Amino acid sequence: MNTVYFSFYPTAQASELEAELGAGLERFWREAAAVLDKGAINLVQPTRASLSLSSNFFSALFLYSYFRAEIPKERRVFYVAINQCLRGLVTGCDNLLDDEYKTTLETDLPAQAHRFRSVLDIMVADRVLFTLLSAYCHQQGLPIDVALRASNACLDALARSGAPEASEEGGIKQRLRPEKVLTDVHHFKTGMLFQAPWVVPALFEQPMPTAAAEAQRSSYRIGIGCQILDDMVDLFVDISRRRHNYVASVIAHGESRKAWGDLQSAHGTGQSPGDFYAAHPGIATRLKREAMEMLQEGLGALFLEPHQHLVGPAAAFIAARIGGLTPG
């Protein structure tokens, strides 16, 4: 699958942009090591897998969008490192909210210490973020206030994205119609989150490249497509925890009473969402098609003409990473 990543970039610049991705990720790790240096917790050097293209798909997409917007190389690398900080913040918060652990920082903490590892990921990512921003401002002769503004802008973007999560704590009182889930919940939760990589460039790229607006629109659609797929995977969990879920809303408001009844019965019986979709293949096919069309529209708008043949493979890769769902 790495060939998909390599092919995102023009052939003459493939190795250069791959190197930029690696340089940005390695810069994040260097700064994280400096933050933890001589402390009680030690950073473990990242594995090749954690720095691989296949583990950093969205980072590669965002880097591609910066390249397409003709942002200079030095700042592209800088933004890759910034985005890794945002990734650490978002993943750490998601881990705590979902009671799981997806690694963003390798340390010598016990593997089972999921909650504290997530807390540490958040603290280190936030510290590295401000370190990167303040160092950049110093190098460019900009006042420290600019770094503070950029840091606050990141917080604002992530807080706007996370607000729907807060509204779900304690459980939702009603299941919104599917269109309302997209406009009132997923718009913020995922659509705007996928635009967050442009928050810092919006301050440092003046004037903003004309291609930036299209890149943000395409990222938004990619994000919504991802969220629909994610909702397919998390259908039973979200129903059990009384969370908003686009798929649940489609079934509750747009399908037969039998389908909704079957869903209500199935989610607490040890069945998987896959079992439910197997019993209702039409629902699964329509939802997967909608998600894939959203992904393909976003990727198609992002990719340059020579790379349009990669839209389908890239969308399929995303779908497989989210839940192993076979695109329909």
Where are the predicted features?
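A structural signal for well-ordered alpha-helices, especially hydrophobic packing surfaces
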Residues: 90-93, 133, 197, 226-229, ...
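Helix-rich alpha-solenoid scaffolding regions
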Residues: 81, 88, 115-124
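All-alpha helical catalytic cores of prenyl diphosphate-utilizing isoprenoid enzymes
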Residues: 20-37, 49-61, 119-229, 236-239
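Primarily interfacial, aromatic-capped hydrophobic alpha-helices that serve as membrane anchors
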Residues: 123-146, 254-305
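Conserved N-terminal diphosphate/IPP-binding helix and adjacent helical/loop segment
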Residues: 1-108, 163-179, 315-328
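A ubiquitous short alpha-helical element
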Residues: 43-50, 111-118, 181-186, 278-286
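Acidic, Mg2+-coordinating active-site segments of isoprenoid diphosphate-utilizing enzymes
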Residues: 64, 91-113, 125, 167, ...
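Short hairpin/turn module used for nucleic-acid contact or packing/dimerization
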Residues: 288-328
